[in-house]
Amino acid sequence: MLRWTTAGESHGQALIAMLEHMPAGVPISREEISFQLGRRRLGFGRGARMKFEADEVSILGGVRHGYTIGSPIAIMVGNTEWPKWTTIMSADAIDESDPDVAAAMSSGRGARLTRPRPGHADFAGMVKYNHDEARPILERSSARETAARVAAATVARSFLRETLGVEVFSHVISIGRSEIDQTVCPTFEDLGRIDDSPVRSASAQAEASMIDQINAAKKQGDTLGGIVEVIVNGLPIGLGSHISGEDRLDAQLAAALMGIQAIKGVEIGDGFEEARRLGSEAHDEIVLRDGVVARQSNRAGGIEGGMTNGESLRVRAAMKPISTVPRALQSIDMDSGKRATGIHQRSDVCAVPAAGVVAEAMVALVLARAVLEKFGGDSLAETKRNIAAYNEYVKTRIAFDGE
C-alpha cells in the first residue's frame, strides 16, 4: 500500500517527505517539485515569510535519472532561514553557559512561549507532551509542514498523469463572506488563469471582493478563512470500496483533507446542501446516452457508496481563520496562571489560496493509493497494462443497445 509521512519542524534545518511503494518508472524531477512548492507560496494575504522563503529541493533516494526505481522515495525541502535558528532549534544539547548560546536563547527568537494561542495546537500540545513552552508544539503543528506533503504529492501527481491521464486542480470558492457564483465550473485548462489570480479564484468578480475582504481584515488586525474545491476529471469507475468504512474513498479523502492544518470541514459533491433536499432532488439519475450509461447530474461529486462512479470528483475543504491573530486574543500564561494575550508569531492574514494547493496534494496522494490498491503493479508499465485491461472490461459493461 502506498504510504507517506513527513518529518521536520517549521524553523528546523529541513523538512523530509517519505513515500513508500510507488512503482518504478514514474517520471519526476526536482524542477517539477519546485514548481508545485512555488504554487503553495501563492496568494494574496500571505505573510512576510513567503517573500524570502525559497524551498530548496533535494531528492535523497528512490529516484535515478529522473524516474522512480521502486524503493522508498525521500525528498528534502531545505529551510533558508535555518542559519538564524541553528542554536534555538539545535538537535544537540546546548550549553547555556556559552555566551553565544545564551545570547541566542535570550533573543526574541529564543524566548520561551508560555501564552498559548486560542485555536492553535499550543495549549493541548503543551499539556499532552509535558512541555513547559509552546515552541516544540508550534514548530511541528505549523502549516510549513505541508511543504513536505506537496513535495511527496508531486510524485503522486505524475503517477496519476501517467496511468490515468488525469490532473488534480483546485480553485477558491470563498474567502470570508465573499464567494463565487455556484455555476462557475472550471476545468484543468483554467488552472493557469486561476494560479494567476491573487486569490486563486476562477471568477474575476469574486476575486475583487475577496481581495477587499483580506485588506479589511488586515487593517483590523484580523485573519480570514474560506473554502477551496478540488476537482479531478476522468477517474475510472471503482476506485475505493463499499466493503468497510476504511475502504470508502470518500472517508479516505475526508481524513486526508481534515489532516491539513486549519481545515475544519469537508464535503464531497454538494455535501451539506444535500441534507436540505428531498431524496428525489438529491441523487443523480442514471440514463443511457448514445448507448452508454451516463448521469443527468453530479450532485454526488463523483463518489457513491465509497467508490468513484465515473463522474468528476469534486471535494471541498473549509479552512478556519488563521489562529495567530495580530489583534491577540485572550489567553493564560502557563507559567504564572495569570491572564495574558496569546503569543504572536509572524503569520498570514489569509492562507486559503495556498490551502487549495495543499488540498490538491492530499487528494493526489489518496487517489494514487486507491489506484495502486485497485490495479497493483511494481512498475508503471505493469500498472498501465492492468488499467488498460480493466478499461476494456468497463467499456463492455456500461454499453447497451438502446436510446
From Swiss-Prot:
Query: Which GO MF terms are attached to this record?
Result: chorismate synthase activity; FMN binding
- Could you say which cofactors this protein requires? FMNH2
Please give the InterPro entries that the UniProt record associates with this protein: Chorismate_synth, Chorismate_synth_AroC_sf, Chorismate_synthase_CS
Q: Which pathway does the UniProt entry assign to this protein?
A: Metabolic intermediate biosynthesis; chorismate biosynthesis; chorismate from D-erythrose 4-phosphate and phosphoenolpyruvate: step 7/7
**Transmembrane residues, as ranges?**
none
Q: What does the entry's cofactor note say about binding and number?
A: Reduced FMN (FMNH(2)).
Known catalytic reactions: 5-O-(1-carboxyvinyl)-3-phosphoshikimate = chorismate + phosphate
EC number assigned by the record: 4.2.3.5
Q: Where does FMN bind?
A: 140-142, 261-262, 305, 320-324, 346
Q: Where does NADP(+) bind?
A: 40, 46
Gene3D superfamilies reported for this sequence:
Chorismate synthase AroC (3.60.150.10)
The family database entries (Pfam families) matched by this protein are listed as: Chorismate_synt (PF01264)
Taxonomically, the superkingdom here is Bacteria
Q: Which GO terms describe its biological process?
A: amino acid biosynthetic process; aromatic amino acid family biosynthetic process; chorismate biosynthetic process
Q: Which UniProt keywords apply?
A: Amino-acid biosynthesis, Aromatic amino acid biosynthesis, FAD, Flavoprotein, FMN, Lyase, NADP
Q: Which GO terms describe its cellular component?
A: cytosol
HAMAP family documented for this protein: Chorismate_synth
Q: Which family does it belong to?
A: Belongs to the chorismate synthase family.
How this chain assembles, per its entry, is: Homotetramer.
Role description: This reaction introduces a second double bond into the aromatic ring system.
What is the protein name stated in its UniProt record? Chorismate synthase
User: Which species?
Assistant: Corynebacterium diphtheriae (strain ATCC 700971 / NCTC 13129 / Biotype gravis)
The gene behind this protein is aroC
